[in-house]
Swiss-Prot record:
The gene is NUP53. Residues 405-438 are annotated as: PSE1 binding. Residues 7-17, 92-104 have a biased composition (Polar residues). CDD domains: RRM_Nup53p_fungi. Phosphorylated by CDC28. The modification N-acetylalanine is found at residue 2. Coiled coil: none annotated. FG repeats lie at residues 124-125, 264-265, 273-274, 470-471. Contains FG repeats. FG repeats are interaction sites for karyopherins (importins, exportins) and form probably an affinity gradient, guiding the transport proteins unidirectionally with their cargo through the NPC. FG repeat regions are highly flexible and lack ordered secondary structure. The overall conservation of FG repeats regarding exact sequence, spacing, and repeat unit length is limited. FG repeat types and their physico-chemical environment change across the NPC from the nucleoplasmic to the cytoplasmic side. Functions as a component of the nuclear pore complex (NPC). NPC components, collectively referred to as nucleoporins (NUPs), can play the role of both NPC structural components and of docking or interaction partners for transiently associated nuclear transport factors. Active directional transport is assured by both, a Phe-Gly (FG) repeat affinity gradient for these transport factors across the NPC and a transport cofactor concentration gradient across the nuclear envelope (GSP1 and GSP2 GTPases associated predominantly with GTP in the nucleus, with GDP in the cytoplasm). It comes from Saccharomyces cerevisiae (strain ATCC 204508 / S288c). It is a peripheral membrane protein. Residues 247-352 form the RRM Nup35-type domain. This is Nucleoporin NUP53. Residues 449-475 are annotated as: Required for nuclear membrane association and proliferation.
Length: 475
């Protein structure tokens, strides 16, 4: 056998060897020993890691014992002889990707902020650690307060590169309105505590009502909030005081210069600029007016403002000063071929339009009413120092006639610098009148009359022939 092995080693196929049948039993025993060693080796490592006394063993076994090494050396190089390696018992946690926020490690011996390897660094688009703002140590992991603070700071503190917040200012206002005080909703009729078995809300008096009005947080973002009855009543009383204190004559205008046939269209045209306090039937019947022109406050609808009108003029009182200024811009417009005038109301202008004396009174005549109002319903006013007061005397009815409608041309209240004044131009035209006209026309007429008289005195045949042929007298 030794001679055969020497010859084989001398040949070029040095890696090929013939295993004798006697060495097959030894080879099987060698495999069994290797399997037993592989099973025993991890248990020894586990005991060493857990603290049991054991002989120090290397993690990677390089060579088997010396008894087997001689036998293994006889095996060729291509024989399956893997290296024995130890499987570590400790599991290392690895991050699959870069996290948005730093992860706090559970082990106390490993520092939380280990930036040597480049992981857990604050990079673009990541949040900052809230413990930096609160000065919390990285090893302080057992306190619940720090976790609460960090969660609050994570929602409040924002980075310039992160996504927009999930909560808005409106949500914070709603939360403040809900949790501000428990006595805010005492007078709310929708609450179950304020509703009895009969279904009627019970009013619970609150001793802190004046304090609640000042300290209550008003939620301007909530559309379902309603004003309390106390605030509504105070607003209504304030509105009534304003209506009583305002002088509606300052918002009044006078429209003049239109014929009575287009009186309704004139009123409807000026009703588009604002709410009119006079109760005109034309405005009631007109269904296409905007809802803004309708009266909303009950105090103004109950009060019927008197109507002052005459032949070709009417007084309109607006609810706001803005509507009056818009209506005054319509001064000088032409409607249906007529020039319309619009001026601010004043007692002097009204007196000039109606040509009334101080003792006479202004009559209320509705343009569309067929029956005249009774004298009891009329409110009589007398002009005393520019203010109308109630007269104690009996009502005296008088009609405004066309002859009394006189407006002086020199009155300053009706003058407009943009308005054209048309003068009398009848003297420019030649008319057959008996009066002697001055100027060129009068001289021409006088010469013609003299020629006629001279021609009549001469009754020769030549003159008669000329008159018959040419007809000079007909000129």
């Amino acid at each position: 056998m030794a001679d055969l092995q020497k010859q084989e080693n001398s040949s070029r196929f040095t890696n090929v060897s013939v295993i004798a049948p006697e060495s097959q039993g030894q080879h099987e025993q060698q495999k069994q020993q290797e399997q037993l060693e592989q099973q025993k080796q991890p248990t020894g490592l586990l005991k060493g890691l857990n603290g049991f006394p054991s002989a120090p063993q290397p993690l990677f076994m390089e060579d088997p014992p010396s008894t087997v090494s001689g036998e293994l050396n006889d095996n060729p190089a291509w024989f399956n002889n893997p290296r024995k390696r130890a499987i570590p018992n400790s599991i290392i946690k690895r991050s699959n990707g870069q996290s948005l926020s730093p992860v706090r490690s559970d082990s106390a011996d490993v520092p939380a902020f280990s930036n040597s390897n480049g992981f857990n660094n604050v990079t673009f688009g990541s949040k900052k650690d809230p413990r930096i703002l609160k000065n919390v140590s990285p090893n302080d992991n057992n306190s619940a307060n720090n976790n609460a603070h960090s969660s609050d700071l994570g929602t409040v503190v924002f980075d310039s590169n992160e996504a927009p917040p999930k909560t808005s200012l409106a949500d914070w206002q709603k939360e403040d309105g809900i949790f501000s005080s428990k006595t805010d909703n005492i007078e709310d009729p929708n609450l179950s505590s304020n509703i009895t078995f009969d279904g009627k809300p019970t009013a619970t008096p609150s001793p802190f009502r004046p304090l609640e009005k000042t300290s209550r947080i008003l939620n301007f973002f909530d559309k379902n909030t309603k004003t309390t009855p106390n605030t509504a009543s105070s607003e209504a009383s304030a509105g009534s005081k304003e209506g009583a204190s305002t002088n509606w004559d300052d918002h009044a205008i006078i429209i003049f210069g239109y014929p009575e046939t287009i009186a309704n269209s004139i009123i409807l045209h000026f009703a588009n600029f604002g709410e009119i306090l006079e109760d005109f039937r034309v405005i009631k019947d007109f269904k296409k007016l905007n809802s803004k022109n309708m009266s909303k406050s009950p105090s103004l609808t109950a009060q019927k403002y008197p109507i002052y009108t005459g032949d070709g003029w009417v007084k309109l009182t607006y609810k706001s000063e803005l509507s009056k200024s818009r209506a005054l811009q319509e001064n000088g417009i032409i409607m249906n071929g007529t020039l319309i005038g619009c001026v601010s109301y004043s007692p002097a202008a009204l007196k000039q339009l109606a040509s009334l004396k101080k003792s006479e009174e202004i009559i209320n005549n509705k343009t569309s009413s067929q029956t005249s109002l009774s004298s009891k319903d009329l409110s009589n006013y007398r002009k005393t120092e520019g203010i109308f007061e109630k007269a104690k005397a009996k009502a005296v009815t008088s009609k405004v006639r066309n002859a009394e409608f006189k407006v002086s041309k020199n009155s300053t209240s009706f003058k407009n610098p943009r308005r054209l004044e048309i003068k009398d131009g009848r003297s420019l035209f030649l008319r057959n009148r008996g009066k002697i006209h001055s100027g060129v026309l009068s001289s021409i007429e006088s010469d013609l009359k003299k020629r006629e008289q001279a021609s009549k005195s001469k009754k020769s045949w030549l003159n008669r022939l000329n008159n018959w042929l040419f007809g000079w007298n007909d000129l």
